[in-house]
């Protein structure tokens, strides 16, 4: 009977090749998910909804859950949102990360709590960002719409424009997905 086993060198090469392909196709599979609640350090604010945090010595981008900041093209609102987030979370700030999911870009999506206070609530109250549930479909436990409504009723931030500026998700959809949130 003839053996159908491949030589060891060929098997090792095939296994290595499959590992490389899987790491390219599924990059987050090699990263452990964050704990549901953990303390992380802010390294930088990338924009009004994305923060670079230190996960055990590795810098990773994370997106604030259940909100949408104005897009870079939506000035001055995008810069104002980023500036307000930088003011709330200067580099080196320790925060509690409450993991929710990963988005389509592979980013961790989470709530960030500073001394027990939800950073997103502050941004929404200031009228810096929009409440948005489009990515997760699981934001009903949060009162973000209430904070947005209060900012809108008092004409704070982006709500100084009647009705507010164009919603970022509408711009993204109109671009055929070319614009990245």
Placement of each model-derived feature along the sequence:
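Small beta-barrel nucleic-acid-binding modules, primarily SNase/OB-fold domains
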Residues: 2-7, 11-17, 22-181
């Amino acid at each position: 009977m003839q053996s159908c086993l491949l030589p060891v060198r060929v098997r090792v090469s095939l296994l290595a090749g499959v590992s490389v392909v899987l790491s390219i196709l599924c990059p987050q599979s090699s990263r452990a998910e964050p704990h549901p609640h953990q303390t992380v350090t802010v390294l930088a604010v990338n924009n009004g909804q994305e923060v670079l945090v230190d996960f055990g010595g590795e810098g990773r981008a994370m997106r604030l859950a259940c909100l949408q900041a104005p897009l870079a093209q939506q000035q001055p609102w995008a810069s104002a949102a980023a500036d307000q987030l930088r003011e709330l979370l200067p580099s080196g700030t320790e925060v509690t990360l409450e993991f929710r999911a990963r988005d389509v870009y592979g980013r961790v999506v989470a709530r960030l709590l500073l001394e027990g206070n939800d950073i997103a609530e502050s941004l929404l109250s200031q009228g810096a960002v929009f409440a948005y549930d489009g990515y997760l479909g699981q934001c009903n436990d949060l009162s973000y719409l209430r904070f947005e409504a209060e900012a809108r009723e008092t004409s704070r931030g982006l709500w100084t424009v009647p009705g507010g500026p164009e919603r970022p998700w509408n711009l993204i959809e109109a671009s055929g997905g070319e614009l990245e949130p």
